[in-house]
Amino acid sequence: MAKDDVIEVEGTVAETLPNAMFKVELENGHTVLAHVSGKIRMHFIRILPGDKVTVELSPYDLTRGRITYRYK
């Protein structure tokens, strides 16, 4: 899948799940299951419930995503 095929949306972390997975509530009201991208994991950036994040969604499965940025 090409990098420019992804859909980027903003949301808020609602719940922390095992294995670095998170339930993220998007601004449009939907809830997606998201995992942490490699760069965030590599730099030990902590993500807690209530944090505002950017999520990349695949156009093929809009229920799963990847957290690519945590706002300060």
From Swiss-Prot:
Residues covered by the S1-like domain: 1-72
Keyword 4Fe-4S included in the entry's annotation: no
Keyword set, alphabetical order: Cytoplasm, Initiation factor, Phosphoprotein, Protein biosynthesis, RNA-binding, rRNA-binding
Pfam families listed in its UniProt record: eIF-1a
Subcellular compartments: Cytoplasm
PTM annotation (Phosphotyrosine): residues: Y60
GO molecular function: ribosome binding; rRNA binding; translation initiation factor activity
Coiled-coil segments on the chain, per record: none
Cellular component terms (Gene Ontology): cytosol
InterPro entries referenced in this protein's UniProt entry, alphabetically: NA-bd_OB-fold (IPR012340), RNA-binding_domain_S1_IF1 (IPR006196), S1_domain (IPR003029), TIF_IF1 (IPR004368)
Transmembrane segments: none
Annotated PROSITE patterns: S1_IF1_TYPE (PS50832)
CDD domains xref list: S1_IF1
Function: One of the essential components for the initiation of protein synthesis. Stabilizes the binding of IF-2 and IF-3 on the 30S subunit to which N-formylmethionyl-tRNA(fMet) subsequently binds. Helps modulate mRNA selection, yielding the 30S pre-initiation complex (PIC). Upon addition of the 50S ribosomal subunit IF-1, IF-2 and IF-3 are released leaving the mature 70S translation initiation complex.
Oligomer and partners: Component of the 30S ribosomal translation pre-initiation complex which assembles on the 30S ribosome in the order IF-2 and IF-3, IF-1 and N-formylmethionyl-tRNA(fMet); mRNA recruitment can occur at any time during PIC assembly.
Similarity section: Belongs to the IF-1 family.
Protein name (Swiss-Prot/TrEMBL): Translation initiation factor IF-1
